Design a protein with these regions (language model features):
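Charged, low-complexity intrinsically disordered regions
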Residues: 1-158
Length: 158
């Protein structure tokens, strides 16, 4: 999106910085009929223009404290967000130590991981081995998205 900086130009408005991961099949038994979006509540103010219209309250109060859910259809949101899936989303946010945004659409799951720094940026004043360890740690966290989130979908009841 862009915001007018002056009458002649616009500057980009940054809504998110981090990694985006797309899983082509969240759960081979389920298809999301429309979008279901799950946002960390801490970052919700930045995403007002990018969400679908219907806010959803789940029956999990801890999940509701940490996440905002929006969907095109309430029934579909409850179909996708089983108690186990909500627990795994919470576990993934804890592993990320940052803001997490998820969107379910048809068979796909889009996961964005907001991190304070670019895990692949090279710093001159930090030893190479320390940077290598940080990159290995960051990529392990990104791989955990599949282990945590896809596992949740595959083992959730119909």
């Amino acid at each position: 999106t862009g915001e007018k900086a002056s009458a002649r130009s616009s500057t980009p408005k940054i809504l998110f910085e981090g990694q985006v991961i797309v899983f082509s099949c969240f759960d081979n038994r389920k298809i999301s009929e429309g979008f279901v979006q799950v946002f960390s509540k801490k970052a919700l103010s930045k995403l007002r223009e990018t969400r679908v219209p219907l806010p959803i309250q789940t029956e999990n109060s801890v999940f509701n404290e940490n996440f905002a859910v929006f969907a095109e259809n309430e029934q579909n949101a409850f179909y996708i967000l089983t108690p186990q899936v909500m627990e795994q989303i919470t576990a993934f946010q804890e592993a990320m130590e940052g803001n997490v945004y998820l969107s379910f659409s048809e068979k796909s799951l889009y996961v964005t991981c907001s991190q304070l720094r670019n895990p692949f940026h090279i710093y001159i004043d930090i030893p190479v081995e320390e940077q290598r360890q940080k990159i290995a740690g960051d990529t392990a966290i990104l791989r955990s998205a599949k282990e945590i989130l896809i596992r949740a979908g595959q083992s959730s009841p119909k």
